[in-house]
Amino acid sequence: MARISFSYLCPASWYFTVPTVSPFLRQRVAFLGLFFIPCVLLLLLIMDLRHWATSLPRDRQYERYLARVGDLEATNTEDPNLNYGLVVDCGSSGSRIFVYFWPRHNGNPHDLLDIKQMRDRNSQPVVKKIKPGISAMADTPEHASDYLRPLLSFAAAHVPVKKHRETPLYILCTAGMRLLPERQQLAILADLVKDLPLEFDFLFSQSQAEVISGKQEGVYAWIGINFVLGRFDHEDESDSDTSVDSAAGRRRTVGILDMGGASLQIAYEVPTSASDLPPKQEEAAKILLAEFNLGCDVQHTEHVYRVYVTTFLGFGGNFARQRYEDLVLNETLNKNRLLGQKTGLSPDNPFLDPCLPVGLTDMVKRNNQVLHFRGKGDWASCRTLLSPLLARSNTSQASLNGIYQSPIDFNNSEFYGFSEFFYCTEDVLRIGGHYHGPTFAKAAQDYCGMAWPVLAQRFKNGLFSSHADEHRLKYQCFKSAWMYEVLHEGFHFPYDYPNLQTAQLVYDREVQWTLGAILYKTRFLPLRDLRQGQGGVRPAHGSWLRLSFVYNHYLFFACTLVVLLAIVLYLLRIHRIHRRQTRASAPLDLLWIEQVVPMIGVQVGP
């Protein structure tokens, strides 16, 4: 039987040989690979940078959040780098002293001092109030310093003794002192300037005790709110809303609306470029506009602001109700005399007041004259009756009482409403916060249309805010209509204006105008650190970190690209060497076939 055997010995190159590819095609593949890899890296770089850019505002917001949390902690009086300042608010009903502190300035002339309210060991704000107002010293001005002694002693106990001599003291008097004759004002201030330095060694001079105007008080309130909201921090805010002054290139500030019991105030930033106005309006605008620089260097203009501020006496919620009652009383009595009626003269024949809840009875006394009211809860009719109290003029650029109002860009503005703006929306209606005109109007109208017994029962059941009382329930219908008319008819806010926030606290704390006052009064203090070379002019630490972060990202991707290119070049080099070896072994393979194949045939036998 014949036996056939085969040899499986083959050249080693046969086991690794791939189908032949033309050199031109291999070059194209290599070129596409070299082109594709950088494109992918570039795409990843762009995506990462976009993520980094969007994360910066979040990081900065987180930093601000941590700073706000730190503001609520007890002040470390052992820190030698802290500075202190005192502001006394001498109001009409009493006086309060506020203690503020701030760390050493960071040396950047573009930054403001980081002023915060001092907190004691229990993390409570360091503030003290006494009554009555300092205007009670009008007949005995020599006792004015005795009147303020408890406040200053309180502050001296909280400020470290070694810091007293460098702690500025500002005594700022408001409404109560404004009503006094100038002679009495000067006598009270003179006693303070003369006697207080004898007992307290705070940094205090004659210019630091004054009676401020309503305009100054409004500007200080505007400064304080915007400072707490971080609107004066212009660093890394490219994604924020644009300023009302497009040429400034900075964050948009907020306007404030504040309706108290007796007065109403509005303040907001206006563009520095004044529009063409008639001579009378231009003169009025100059009186109502305040332009100031919060920066320490007058050559730097990023903190120059132009603010419109006006106070309307008699337009507060309680005073407006009195004006309304006087108007109704006079008109009703005159109508009774002309028509021989007795409307409102007895509880059985009351005046039907659309501004009171349904069925609520009330009574008004004026000069031995009595008028009886009964609510009928018609919110729309109430608004109509309130319209004459706005005292508007036919001029398009006039607001309440015919006073000039600088134009507001309602498409690029933001406002915060305090006091009555918050109470009207929150205490009873429970819709405080973001204000929406139609929603508020519907809620106010529904409330006014409810029967008084139903509202009283809801109050007993605790369905309203804990701050609501019987007075709020009785006059909520009136005050909501008054607030609505003032906002939309008086100040010309659109009914669907989306950027009004009603609030009582800002970041869980009450913001006083005194904060704005000390910010403005101490604006030049950073120059001391700059001149002494304490820190010098340098970018903020956060900016350095962000620049370093960008540099590291670029360096990482550059190194990655170099490594990948080196790998590609190495693979190409290996491929070329392998191809040369394959070509060199081809003749040997042919020779091997010629020699071995015949031997295979010989092994085949019978």
Swiss-Prot record:
Glycosylation sites: 330
Disulfide bonds, paired cysteine numbers: 448-477
Annotated compartments: Cytoplasmic vesicle membrane
A GO molecular function held by the record: CTPase activity
Alphabetical UniProt keywords: Calcium, Cytoplasmic vesicle, Disulfide bond, Glycoprotein, Hydrolase, Magnesium, Membrane, Metal-binding, Transmembrane, Transmembrane helix
A GO CC term assigned to this protein in UniProt: cytoplasmic vesicle membrane
Description of the deletion phenotype: Deficient mice are born at the normal Mendelian ratios and grow healthily until 16 week of age. Normal lymphocyte development is observed. However deficient mice shown an increased in ATP concentrations in the small intestinal lumen and increased numbers of IL-17-producing Th17 cells in the small intestinal lamina propria. They show increased resistance to Citrobacter rodentium infection and increased susceptibility to experimental autoimmune encephalomyelitis.
Major localisation: membrane
Enzymatic class: hydrolase
Ranges of the Vesicular topological domain: 50-548
GO biological process: CTP catabolic process; GTP metabolic process; nucleobase-containing small molecule catabolic process; regulation of immune response; ribonucleoside diphosphate catabolic process; ribonucleoside triphosphate catabolic process; T-helper 17 cell differentiation; UTP catabolic process
Record EC number: 3.6.1.15
Tissue specificity field: Widely expressed. Expressed at high level in brain, kidney, liver, testis and small intestin. Weakly expressed in lung, thymus and heart.
Function: Catalyzes the hydrolysis of nucleoside triphosphates and diphosphates in a calcium- or magnesium-dependent manner. Preferentially hydrolyzes nucleoside 5'-triphosphates, with substrate preference for UTP > GTP > CTP. Hydrolyzes nucleoside diphosphates only to a minor extent. In contrast to its human ortholog is able to hydrolyze ATP. In the epithelial cells of small intestine controls luminal ATP levels, therefore regulating Th17-cell development.
Family affiliation: Belongs to the GDA1/CD39 NTPase family.
Name recorded for this polypeptide: Ectonucleoside triphosphate diphosphohydrolase 7
Organism: Mus musculus
Originating gene: Entpd7
